[in-house]
């Protein structure tokens, strides 16, 4: 029989070994998360305010020697004199707390979050990536089936080459602590990032460092590429600047974050020939109105006038209108000056519509001549698996050292004729998105996200529908009141609205109901089927 003292010694030894190999936390700067309120809304039109907070990603943090001030990572290079392997760097290096405004240019006020592009303190910081927290050590997760996600945005100060991106990824809610016990930092310090590019520029993945095989970037003084990448599904709700915008679905083979190795990761960080070698779809099925020929829909002075703030609504429609149904459509609406604006439709007969559906994605890939990796990795069904499983909200501002953001706001690829379908994505010249140029010439750029709302369909916004006659317009009014529940203060908004039918034989409000080549429903559950052009009619 083993005596209790022997058991104690063994447990103590194992505990010491685990700690010695763990991803560490610094003690010099207290981690205080900036507060950010957001709302959950129901079909009755009532919205409850939640007092949340945001945390900056671990990749932006000071990484230093445990118990000292020597940098483990400086510029875009690891200090191999401190550690030289993924496991030893995890035990010898610590992630430090953040000073959000002075170091990273991140400020919050109520429901508003502002991200500055370039912030100069002791070092120059470029951009940022933050996550919404449920509590100090857990990311907020959203299950988006049969729901909508809404926010206000100001992109008027984002020129060519910048991307104010708000999106969802399938990160672990605790930042990876449960699955990878060597990760002692967790969500509190912004660990566990992943996306559909399987990024290899992360300093830590799965509780270990990424020093092995690390190659400093030749163009980015702050970044490099390691042997490992971090993969997971990604739903880009919003990627935009003052010129162009897009929303994109990126499915993966697994709904859970996974680590990959080398060029088998695929995506942006692998050789061009290996772009599609990974377990995720790096291209996705995207909708950029400009790319689909609708060049007057989004931009300064256009239908959605981005010289001033506006509201973005994204709806996730299931086949039977239930939370457990199959994802069939990802729909976009805008609200500006009290008017609800349906997404600008494609002008191409071969790929008609204004939302992401399985048939639209297939038609898009065929029309543009793109490799249909979306279908290879499960298409809208696989994207639905991730959305139903729960995803973490990311709010970011970044520039692009790999492709100069041309894929968003210019002609891309640059070797193709700009008049070919799908090549022109915006009006930016192909010479303007260079990251070094943007950082030097537009350091004062910023994006503001505010009034985040999540709820049942048609519960998070109000306004008068655009287009069509007055008989097809539905006026939505709001009336605010306050109430206190438990220890939280909640704001309840009452709203009269028209609720979409869940029938599969009719088009939903703001959905497509006709046009050349259209084979879907032609009757509206709400509103009137209104012709926008020969290829697109919409329920308004």
Swiss-Prot record:
Catalytic activity from the UniProt record: Hydrolysis of (1->4)-beta-D-glucosidic linkages in cellulose and cellotetraose, releasing cellobiose from the non-reducing ends of the chains
GO molecular function: cellulose 1,4-beta-cellobiosidase activity; cellulose binding
Positions of the UniProt region annotated as Catalytic: 23-459
Enzyme nomenclature, EC number: 3.2.1.91
Signal sequence, start to end: 1-22
Annotated ranges, domain CBM1: 505-540
GO biological process: cellulose catabolic process
Keyword Hydrolase annotated: yes
Keyword Disulfide bond: yes
Assigned keywords, A-Z: Carbohydrate metabolism, Cellulose degradation, Disulfide bond, Glycoprotein, Glycosidase, Hydrolase, Polysaccharide degradation, Signal
Region of interest called Ser/Thr-rich linker, as start-end residue ranges on this chain: 460-505
Region span, Disordered: 464-502
GO cellular component, one term: extracellular region
Disulfide bonds: 513-529, 524-539
Top-level taxon in the UniProt lineage: Eukaryota
Residue positions of the active site: 234, 239
Sugar-bearing residue positions: 434, 458
Biological function: The biological conversion of cellulose to glucose generally requires three types of hydrolytic enzymes: (1) Endoglucanases which cut internal beta-1,4-glucosidic bonds; (2) Exocellobiohydrolases that cut the disaccharide cellobiose from the non-reducing end of the cellulose polymer chain; (3) Beta-1,4-glucosidases which hydrolyze the cellobiose and other short cello-oligosaccharides to glucose.
Family: Belongs to the glycosyl hydrolase 7 (cellulase C) family.
Protein name: 1,4-beta-D-glucan cellobiohydrolase B
Gene name of this polypeptide: cbhB
């Amino acid at each position: 029989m083993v005596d209790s003292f022997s058991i104690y010694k063994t447990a103590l030894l194992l505990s010491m070994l685990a700690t010695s190999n763990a991803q560490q936390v610094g003690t010099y700067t207290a981690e205080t998360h900036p507060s950010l309120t957001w709302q959950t809304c129901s079909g009755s039109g009532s919205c409850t305010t939640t007092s949340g907070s945001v945390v900056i990603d671990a990749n932006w943090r000071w990484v230093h020697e445990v118990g000292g001030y020597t940098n483990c990572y400086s510029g875009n290079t690891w200090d191999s004199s401190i550690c030289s392997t993924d496991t030893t760097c995890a035990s010898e290096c610590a992630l430090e707390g953040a000073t959000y405004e002075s170091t990273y240019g991140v400020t919050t006020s109520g429901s508003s979050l502002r991200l500055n592009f370039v912030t100069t303190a002791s070092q120059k910081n470029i951009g940022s990536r933050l996550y919404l927290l449920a509590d100090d050590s857990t990311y907020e997760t959203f299950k988006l089936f049969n729901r909508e996600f809404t926010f206000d945005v100001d992109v008027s100060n984002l020129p060519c080459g910048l991307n104010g991106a708000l999106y969802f990824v399938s990160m672990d809610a605790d930042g990876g602590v449960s699955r990878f016990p060597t990760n002692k930092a967790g969500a509190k310090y912004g660990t566990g990032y992943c996306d559909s590019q399987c990024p290899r520029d992360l300093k830590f993945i799965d509780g270990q460092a990424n020093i092995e095989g690390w190659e400093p970037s030749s163009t980015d003084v702050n970044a490099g590429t390691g042997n490992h990448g971090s993969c997971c599904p990604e739903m880009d709700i919003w990627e935009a600047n003052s010129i162009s915008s897009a929303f994109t679905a990126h499915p993966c083979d697994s709904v859970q974050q996974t680590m990959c190795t080398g060029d088998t990761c695929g995506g942006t960080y692998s050789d061009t020939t290996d772009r599609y070698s990974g377990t995720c779809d790096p291209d996705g099925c995207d909708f950029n109105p400009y790319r689909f020929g609708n060049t007057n829909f989004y931009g300064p002075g256009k239908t959605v006038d981005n010289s001033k703030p506006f509201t973005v609504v994204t709806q996730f429609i299931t086949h039977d209108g239930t939370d457990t149904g199959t994802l069939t459509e990802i729909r976009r609406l805008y609200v500006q000056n009290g008017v609800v604006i349906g997404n600008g439709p494609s002008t191409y007969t071969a790929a008609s519509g204004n939302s992401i559906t399985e048939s639209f994605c297939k038609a898009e890939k065929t029309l543009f001549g793109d490799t249909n990796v979306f279908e290879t990795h499960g298409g809208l069904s696989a994207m639905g698996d991730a959305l139903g499983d729960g995803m973490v909200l990311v709010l970011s501002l970044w520039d692009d050292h790999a492709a100069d953001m041309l894929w968003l706001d210019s002609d891309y690829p640059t070797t193709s004729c700009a008049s070919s379908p799908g090549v022109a994505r915006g009006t930016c010249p192909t010479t303007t998105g260079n990251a070094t140029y943007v950082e030097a010439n537009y350091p004062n750029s910023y994006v503001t996200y505010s009034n985040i709302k999540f709820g049942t369909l048609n519960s998070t916004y109000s306004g008068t529908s655009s287009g069509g006659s007055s008989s097809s317009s539905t006026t939505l009014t709001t009336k605010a009141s306050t109430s206190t529940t438990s220890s939280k203060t909640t704001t309840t908004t009452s709203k009269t609205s028209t609720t979409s039918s869940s029938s599969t034989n009719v088009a939903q409000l703001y959905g497509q109901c006709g046009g050349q080549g259209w084979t879907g429903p032609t009757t509206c559950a709400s509103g009137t089927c209104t012709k926008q052009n020969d290829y697109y009619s919409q329920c308004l």
